[in-house]
Regions:
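Intrinsically disordered, low-complexity regions enriched in Ser/Pro/Gly/Gln/His and often acidic
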Residues: 1-2, 109
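Short, Lys/Arg-enriched N-terminal segments with co-localized hydrophobic residues
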Residues: 2-25
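Residue-level recognition of conserved structural "scaffold" positions that shape functional pockets
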Residues: 9-10, 19, 127, 179, ...
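Intrinsically disordered, low-complexity acidic Ser/Thr-rich regulatory segments
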Residues: 17-28, 34-184, 194, 244
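Surface-exposed, flexible loop/turn segments at secondary-structure boundaries
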Residues: 132, 210, 238
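Forkhead-associated
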Residues: 161-234
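Edge beta-strands of extracellular beta-sandwich domains
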Residues: 236-244
Length: 244
C-alpha cells in the first residue's frame, strides 16, 4: 500500500487512515468498459443517442464520488446516491437495468479500491431533462443510510458470525460500533477494519489489550487474508470474505 498514517482518537472522534498512494480512476473505468462491452454492444446507439457514452458517465460518477468524500467516524465516507440528468436527445427514456447496475458497480468498486465507506447501497438514476445542454451531464449526490450486503465475516470461536457490511468498519465495545464485541477485554473503540487497494486491512486504534493477526501484533495496519485469525484482546475471530 505504500504506507499509512493513522490517527488514533477516543470514542466519538473521527478516525482517519490516509494512504500515501491512491489508485487511478482509469483502471476502474477500463474494467467498467470491459464489463459493458457485451451489455451495450448494439445497444449504446439506442440508449445513448447523442455524444455521451456509458463510459463517460462512469468517469463522471467516480469523479463526483471523489468530490463527495467527507471524514466520518470511520474515516473517509463517500455519497451513495447519485442522480444523473441528461438532455432527452442524449438519452432514451428506457434505460436497461443492466446499464444502471454496471454504473452502480463501478462506484462500489471505486469505494472498495480507495477505502471509502458507503453508509448504504449505491443507487444511480438516469433522468432526461430539457434544461441540461446536449452532450453534458448534471449530477446530484446524496447520502441515504441503509443495510448493505456483507463482504466478509468475523466468526467467533463460538460460531457466531459478525457480518462486515461497510467498506470501513469500527470494531469495539461501544454502542455505536459497526461490529460490536461485548467482551470486557475489548476496548470501546478497539480497531478499524476496511478494504482498500484489493486487500482487507485492520489496525489497532490504541486499544488496551491490542490487536493481532495470525499471531502478529502491530500498531501499523495488518493485512487480512481468507482464514486469518484476528485476536482482539482476549477474544479470537476468523476472517473470511463472503466470496470464498
Amino acid at each position: 500500500m505504500g504506507g499509512l498514517m493513522v490517527d488514533r482518537r477516543s470514542a466519538g472522534d473521527t478516525i482517519s487512515i490516509h494512504p500515501y498512494r491512491r489508485l487511478t480512476p482509469m483502471k476502474l473505468v477500463r474494467d467498467f468498459e470491459r464489463r459493458l462491452e457485451k451489455l451495450v454492444d448494439g445497444m449504446a446507439g439506442k440508449v445513448f443517442r447523442g455524444k455521451l457514452h456509458p463510459v463517460e458517465l462512469a468517469t463522471r460518477l467516480v469523479r463526483e464520488a471523489d468530490l463527495s468524500v467527507e471524514e466520518s467516524g470511520a474515516g473517509p465516507t463517500a455519497a451513495n446516491v447519485y442522480g444523473l440528468k441528461l438532455n432527452p436527445r442524449d438519452l432514451d427514456f428506457e434505460v436497461p437495468a443492466g446499464v444502471i447496475h454496471e454504473l452502480e458497480q463501478v462506484l462500489e468498486s471505486a469505494a472498495a479500491d480507495r477505502g471509502w465507506r458507503l453508509d448504504g447501497p449505491v443507487t444511480v438514476t438516469l433522468e432526461p431533462d430539457e434544461s441540461v445542454s446536449q452532450g453534458t451531464v448534471s449530477c446530484r449526490v446524496g447520502r441515504s443510510p441503509g443495510l448493505r450486503q456483507p463482504w466478509a465475516n468475523l466468526t467467533a470461536e463460538t460460531g457466531l458470525k459478525h457480518p462486515i457490511r461497510y467498506n470501513r468498519c469500527t470494531v469495539g465495545r461501544a454502542d455505536g460500533s459497526d461490529i460490536g464485541i461485548g467482551d470486557p477485554g475489548v476496548s470501546r473503540v478497539h480497531a478499524l477494519l476496511w478494504r482498500e487497494g484489493g486487500e482487507a486491512w485492520i489496525v489497532d486504534l490504541g486499544s488496551a489489550n491490542g490487536t493481532e493477526v495470525d499471531g502478529s501484533s502491530s500498531t501499523s495496519p495488518l493485512v487480512l487474508t481468507s482464514g486469518s485469525v484476528v485476536r482482539l484482546g482476549p477474544v479470537s475471530f476468523r476472517f473470511r470474505p463472503v466470496s470464498d
